[in-house]
Amino acid sequence: STCAMLEAILLASGYRVALYTSPHLVRFNERARVNGQAVQDEWLLERFEQVEQARGDTSLTYFEFTTLAILAGFQHESLDACILEVGLGGRLDAVNLIDADCSIVTSVDIDHAEYLGDTREAIGFEKAHIFRAGRPAICADPVPVKSLVDHAQSIGADLWLFGRDFNYSGDRQQWAYGGRSVRRGSLAYPALRGANQLLNASGVLAALEAMRMRLPVSAQAIRQGLAIDRKSTRLNSSHANISYA
């Protein structure tokens, strides 16, 4: 939902946006969207052939191969922003090869323990590796783990913590976002339902606040984007790169 909201707001702002997510629900093409539309078969086949020819004897996993192909395709799309969803964890994920301009960790939960570790501290360490030195690193988890905070500080990332740097408040009709220097009030609740949607939405608005000099968005675009009910997804861009785990 974080990427879905971010994509919708940026599209409502008139930006040309690409989105890479996984897994797909029905068709593989769902993994790559440009301006809100899934790419065509021909678009994918051309990029698959490009990666197959370039890899030589290098062995690639399914996810590595498809990630490289889709990123290669996005390079030709004259994008303003590209949203990339991390597949698993962060530190060793293929998506992490992108040097993101902004990164979002929405939560640190016990998941995929056989690969990421069986504690929140271990998983937080893996996820924190999508952060970059000197760039916004958004953490929307209300109880951030020490390993994530320590790594962000050790590399000199611009760490934004929920409850310290940004927050939200709300009543039955509307909610409000408060950041370091931006406040957004009278917001309708996100079309995407769920217990964590305001946490996710506040993380999105924190990322947009952090990137506002490169990707300015209006209050109208935010309201319009939050009202759109899109498939759950995630984020990163190379003209305004944002990563999400």
Can you annotate each of these PLM segments?
Residues T58, S78-E85, A100-A188, A201-R223, ...:
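Acidic, Mg2+-coordinating active-site environments of NTP-dependent enzymes
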Residues R55-L60, Y189-A195:
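A short glycine/serine-rich beta->alpha loop
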Residues T2-R16:
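A conserved segment at the C-terminal end of the G1
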Residues I9-S13, G73, A207-R214:
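Active-site catalytic microenvironments for nucleophilic, acid-base chemistry
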